[in-house]
From Swiss-Prot:
Protein's name according to its UniProt entry: Uncharacterized protein MJ0764
CDD domains in the record: cupin_Mj0764-like
Database matches in Pfam families: Cupin_1
Gene3D superfamilies: Jelly Rolls
The species this protein was found in: Methanocaldococcus jannaschii (strain ATCC 43067 / DSM 2661 / JAL-1 / JCM 10045 / NBRC 100440) (Methanococcus jannaschii)
Top-level taxon of the source organism: Archaea
């Protein structure tokens, strides 16, 4: 078999953070945030695409005002940008994080650096 299949949790109602794919070229995470949850504020450790598949994401980059993005949106975040992802408005926010190239290719840590 040439292809490789990855599975992710479906219909989660609690917070989920799964590192699904971690190859030399790309890193793909699956995240579910119930209302009121957020990811720790951190710096993007690669060129990031946020693929929102359920709910509405509130995203704050650097010192900008927060912006809301809904399911069906793909949001690009450049390398080394301070970011905060929150679920303020939806019962469930579900999204994928695609990091390409893999952070190691940019001499960045594999896990993002948290900030205040």
């Amino acid at each position: 078999m040439i292809e490789k299949v990855y599975e992710f949790k479906r219909d989660a109602k609690t917070k989920v953070v799964e590192k699904l794919v971690n190859t030399e070229h790309v890193q793909i995470n699956h995240i579910v945030l119930p209302r009121g949850e957020q990811m720790p504020k951190h710096y993007s450790n690669s060129y990031v695409h946020l693929i929102i598949i359920k709910g509405e994401m509130t995203l704050t980059l650097e010192d900008q005002e927060p912006h809301n993005y809904k399911e069906g949106n793909i949001v690009y975040v450049p390398f080394n940008v301070k970011m905060l992802i929150q679920n303020i408005n939806s019962d469930i926010l579900e999204f994928f994080v695609v990091k390409a190239p893999h952070p190691k290719k940019l001499n960045a840590p594999e896990d993002p650096i948290k900030c205040e």
